[in-house]
């Protein structure tokens, strides 16, 4: 769904997978809110939310994602609008 640009559906599917304990889904869900990722994706009309991105990256970290810590650090160094 992300590759197709359907962020809303991707978020819904990722949330369901997070409820099942998926660290990868939590990481992916965080990415759907991450302003850097959304910019790279070229997702126009989708609001970035750094707080939500951080929340889901933190959850991914709690579930065992090693990538989540890097994403949290990168997000922390991103200038806020």
Q: Which residues does each predicted region cover?
A:
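Short helix-capping/linker turns of helical repeat alpha-solenoids
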Residues: 1, 5-6, 14, 19-23, ...
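Short hydrophobic/aromatic segments of transmembrane alpha-helices and their interfaces
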Residues: 7-8, 50
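Short coil/linker segments at helix-helix boundaries
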Residues: 35-57
């Amino acid at each position: 769904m992300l590759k197709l640009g359907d962020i809303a559906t991707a978020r819904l599917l990722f949330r369901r997978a997070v409820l099942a304990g998926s660290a990868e889904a939590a990481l992916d869900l965080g990415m759907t809110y991450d302003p850097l990722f959304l910019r790279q994706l070229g997702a126009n009309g989708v609001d970035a939310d750094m707080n939500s991105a951080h929340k889901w990256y933190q959850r991914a970290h709690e579930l065992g994602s090693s990538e989540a810590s890097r994403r949290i650090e990168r997000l922390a160094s991103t200038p806020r609008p």
